[in-house]
Amino acid sequence: MCTAAAFQTKDFYFGRTLDYECSYGECVTVTPRRYPFSFRHMGRLDAHYAMIGMAHVADGYPLYYDAVNEAGLGMAGLNFVGNAQYAEVQEGKENVAQFELIPWILGRCATVREARARLDALNLVGTPFSEHYPAAQLHWLLADKDEAVVIESMADGLHVYDDPAGVLTNNPPFPQQLFNLNNYMALSPRQPENRFSGALGLHCYSRGMGALGLPGDLSSMSRFVRVAYTKLNAVCRDTEAENVSQFFHILGAVEQQRGCCEVEPGAYEYTIYTSCCNATRGIYYYTTYDNHQLTAVDLHRAELEGEALSSWPLVTGEQIFHQN
């Protein structure tokens, strides 16, 4: 289970939480402009946009969970188990395996508008990376500073949906998630007025009562509502530090604590990492479950003209500043 969000202030920010019961050794990874992407059905891509994101590197290949390219386009894959279904290879189509979708789009496209044209010809196939890495059932949030879309491949084909909320979680399919927000249109950051009955002297006895009914559980539909409400009502300031901090607070609204979501006896889903990339500047910030200090990796401080990946292992231990 995961949550992703796109957030526009003075700069454009894109990030996500990764919620799962175990880590796969992911690290912050920069793919330079001349790293040779070898696609299973579409040949090689030897020159492309550089990108930065979180990836598990297997056999020298970056399996990106989320990434942002140097043009400011961001993309994240989130679990879509039970609904995701991929096609068979078809002649005359751009046959791209699901694990290749992030580099296929981010390597070639600078905007969502450009990506839409690519997606029109896309045939998303279930070719696995290897026998050890079967095709993951995913859907994707794709966003730039101007718009966001959700990409879902299902039994009835490939869908690209406008996402005015700029957020994504997991099941059910995106149209149901967006429609469900109708049930929460009365939520407000302001204190409510008594509309129950003029015959009763009802009054607010606490701050925050305008958001009564905002779901607080960890299910994906509830997290969609909560992160959308938090993001769309968040107040922004002027500095990079303040905006990055605010983005982490937005995703903190859906953070999962170890012990609250048991997936099997003794195994618990929790927020392994939270990311926030300033897509305008190419700076990737993250925290981990046991380290709340922000760590940053700058795309433009890496070697971008070479062919070799650059990776940084996550700082996972808590960093405590002692004041005395």
Language-model segments: what does each one mean?
Residues 28, 68, 149-153, 275:
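Broad, structure-driven detector of short, well-ordered beta-strand segments within folded domains
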Residues 1-94, 126, 311-315, 322-324:
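A contiguous strand-loop segment
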Residues 121-159:
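Catalytic cofactor-binding cores of redox enzymes
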Residues 92-128, 240-249:
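Proteins synthesized as precursors that undergo proteolytic processing into mature forms
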Residues 20-23, 81-83, 156-159, 166, ...:
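Short, surface-exposed beta-strand-loop junctions and turns on beta-sheet-rich folds
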Residues 15, 76-78, 151-152, 285-287:
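Beta-strand residues in well-ordered beta-sheet regions across diverse protein folds
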Residues 1-13, 49, 128-130, 135-136, ...:
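C-terminus-biased signal that marks the final domain/tail of proteins
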